[in-house]
Structure formats: C-alpha cells, structure tokens
C-alpha cells in the first residue's frame, strides 16, 4: 500500500519552518511521502545557513521565486514566498497530486507587507474554497475550536449572532459528528443570568437549535469560561468551542503547547498545521522542536483514513 502523499507548505523562510522540515524529514518519511513546496535555490540557501545536509530523498515541488533569507526578520519577500508555497500546496491537493496539506508557520505582518489581504491560512482557505472553514487547535487530549479568530476583542460580542453561531455548530458537526462538545460562554460567570451580559442567551438559543437539528445533545453549555478547562471538565469533554481567540488558546497552550496542532475543518481538502509561530528569535539556531509538526503529519494521515 502506497504512503499518503502530503504537500508541505514551507512557511516563512526567515523563521523555523524549514529547519523543522529538514530536521524531522527522516521520521516524517516513515509516516508518509512528503512533498516540499520550495525550489532548490531557496532550499540550498536555508540548508547552508543551518549547516544541514539535505536528505537525498527530500522531494520538492518547485515554487518559483528567489530572495535572500533574512533570518529572524519580518520581510515582504519571505511573506510572499510563504503565500506562494501555500497556494502551490493547495493546488497539488486540488489536482489530486497530494492527499493533504501540512503548513509551517507564516508571519501575518510579512503577508501584509507583501500586499496580501489575508490574515492567515484559514482566512485564505475560506475565500479560496468559498466555505466557512473552522479553526480548531489542540492535541489528542483536548481540541479547541474558535468561533471568532483574529478580530479585536472589542468586536467579539457584536460578532455573536444566532444564525451565524448555529451554522458554526452545524458545520462543526459535519467534521466532528459524534463527539459531545463543551461550548464556552462569553462573559464572566457566563453572564450570571443577564447581570453581566446577554450574549449567553444567544449562545443558548443556538445550542438548542443546533442540537435539535443534529438529533442529539452534542453541544453543551454555555459553560462558565473560568472553569471550563479545569481537570473535572476536561475529564468529560475532549472538544471545546471558545467564543474568541485567547479564551480558548491561552489555556490550551498552557497545557499542551509543544504537542498541539492546528486543523482546518469544513473544507474539501485536509489541512493541518503546527500550532506555533515563526519563532524568529530562534530562527536558524537549531533549537526548534519538531513535535507539533510530526503530530500535524499524523493528524493529516488520520483524517485521510476517516474520509
């Protein structure tokens, strides 16, 4: 049986992504057939800076473009190349030349400097596929999906609309159909029956309606946010839905930073990613850890087996 073929988007080459890819290649090659979206010029430049030998079976799919790597720097050229690598990886999946995409970290400011309008991978995937992709992060011990992602905190409350939230729950069910899911409230004490805010009324209505639609009590809540990730609750739930970015990711990363990954749900392709940034502060210093990347590879393979 042939190995799963995974297109690797190399991320921002001024960061740690390419170090992780080369360092983990031997182990990853035992799990799948990785195809790295980079050209030989950029790969050789990065490997020289790292003083790493490129493995003989390090297969690349050429992505055009040449620039000087500026390790640890925010740069429009590296931003543009990380975008081009990602688009190339998506195209390989669409052409059935790859079974999944795994992404290394990009830098959002570098994308902005390159004139790109997207706030990140998930934002691009939504527009590319015209689907409401869901960002979910975590590991086998706990996963957290985000209702709102990269928006200012002041805009979160106004983003909580009944129809939008209900559809989010139903889209989540399409990807994770059989698991019970803990849904967090927005306000302290989950609003204290309206004393500290009314958004929980909207969340409750959306939960009830979605559960009726999926024909079982899949979504439970809204839970009081400050106790949602306590050991007692985590014994009952593996999946959580947070109303905003830091509400869900601060506890996740405090508990499982090194091993967590990022998964895009509700899409026609499989896409997983490392759950960390470009780590410019340690770029090309041979200090980057590979566990999140290896877990992202394993999850992409597992998701493919489920389809």
Swiss-Prot record:
Keyword line: Cobalt, Cytoplasm, Magnesium, Metal-binding, NAD, NADP, Oxidoreductase, Pyridoxine biosynthesis, Zinc
S-S pairs: none
Reaction(s) this enzyme catalyzes, per UniProt: 4-(phosphooxy)-L-threonine + NAD(+) = 3-amino-2-oxopropyl phosphate + CO2 + NADH
Location in or out of the cell: Cytoplasm
Binding site for substrate: 121-122, 253, 262, 271
Main location: cytoplasm
Pfam family, one: PdxA
Pathway per the UniProt entry: Cofactor biosynthesis; pyridoxine 5'-phosphate biosynthesis; pyridoxine 5'-phosphate from D-erythrose 4-phosphate: step 4/5
Keyword ATP-binding annotated: no
Essential cofactor(s): Zn(2+); Mg(2+); Co(2+)
Entry's Gene Ontology molecular function annotations: 4-hydroxythreonine-4-phosphate dehydrogenase activity; cobalt ion binding; magnesium ion binding; NAD binding; zinc ion binding
Known role: Catalyzes the NAD(P)-dependent oxidation of 4-(phosphooxy)-L-threonine (HTP) into 2-amino-3-oxo-4-(phosphooxy)butyric acid which spontaneously decarboxylates to form 3-amino-2-oxopropyl phosphate (AHAP).
Protein name: 4-hydroxythreonine-4-phosphate dehydrogenase
């Amino acid at each position: 049986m042939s190995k799963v073929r995974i297109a690797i988007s190399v991320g921002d080459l001024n960061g740690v992504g390419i170090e992780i890819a080369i360092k983990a290649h031997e182990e990853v090659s035992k799990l799948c057939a990785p195809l790295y979206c980079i050209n030989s010029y950029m790969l050789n430049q990065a490997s020289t800076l790292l003083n790493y030998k490129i493995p003989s079976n390090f297969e690349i799919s050429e992505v055009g473009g040449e620039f000087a790597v500026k390790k640890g720097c925010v740069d429009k050229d590296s931003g543009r190349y990380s975008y081009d690598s990602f688009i190339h990886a998506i195209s390989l999946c669409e052409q059935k030349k790859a079974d999944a995409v795994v992404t290394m970290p990009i830098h959002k400011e570098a994308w902005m400097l390159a004139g790109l309008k997207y706030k990140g991978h998930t934002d691009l995937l939504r527009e590319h596929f015209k689907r409401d992709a869901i960002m979910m992060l975590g590991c086998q011990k706990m996963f957290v999906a985000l209702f709102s992602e990269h928006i200012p905190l002041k805009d979160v409350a106004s983003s909580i609309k009944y129809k939008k939230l209900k559809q989010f729950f139903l889209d989540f069910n399409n990807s994770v159909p059989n698991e019970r899911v803990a849904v967090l409230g927005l306000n302290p004490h989950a609003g204290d029956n309206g004393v500290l805010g009314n958004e929980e009324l909207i969340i409750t209505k959306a939960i009830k309606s979605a559960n009726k639609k999926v024909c079982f009590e899949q979504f439970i809540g809204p839970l009081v946010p400050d106790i949602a990730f306590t050991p007692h609750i985590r014994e009952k739930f593996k999946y959580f839905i947070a109303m905003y970015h830091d509400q869900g990711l601060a506890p996740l990363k405090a508990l499982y930073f090194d091993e967590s990954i990022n998964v895009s749900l509700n899409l026609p392709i499989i896409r997983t990613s490392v759950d960390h940034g470009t780590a410019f502060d340690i770029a090309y210093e041979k200090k980057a850890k590979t566990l999140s990347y290896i877990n992202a590879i394993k999850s992409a393979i597992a998701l493919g087996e489920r389809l």
